């Protein structure tokens, strides 16, 4: 699971 990666491509997903 690489959530930090999705946050990079999808900042909105980070929230």
UniProtKB/Swiss-Prot annotation:
The keyword Lipid biosynthesis is assigned to this record: no
Keywords: Disulfide bond, Neuropeptide, Pyrrolidone carboxylic acid, Secreted
Subcellular location: Secreted
Family statement: Belongs to the allatostatin family.
Modified residues (Pyrrolidone carboxylic acid): 1
Coiled coil location: none
Disulfide bonds: 7-14
Tissue: Expressed in the CNS and midgut but not in the ring gland, thoracic perisymapthetic organs (tPSO) or abdominal perisymapthetic organs (aPSO) (at protein level).
A GO BP annotation: neuropeptide signaling pathway
Function: Strongly inhibits juvenile hormone biosynthesis. May act as a neurotransmitter or neuromodulator.
Name used for this protein in its record: Allatostatin-C1
CC per GO annotation: extracellular region
Domain of life: Eukaryota
């Amino acid at each position: 699971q690489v959530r930090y990666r999705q946050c990079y491509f999808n900042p909105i997903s980070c929230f």
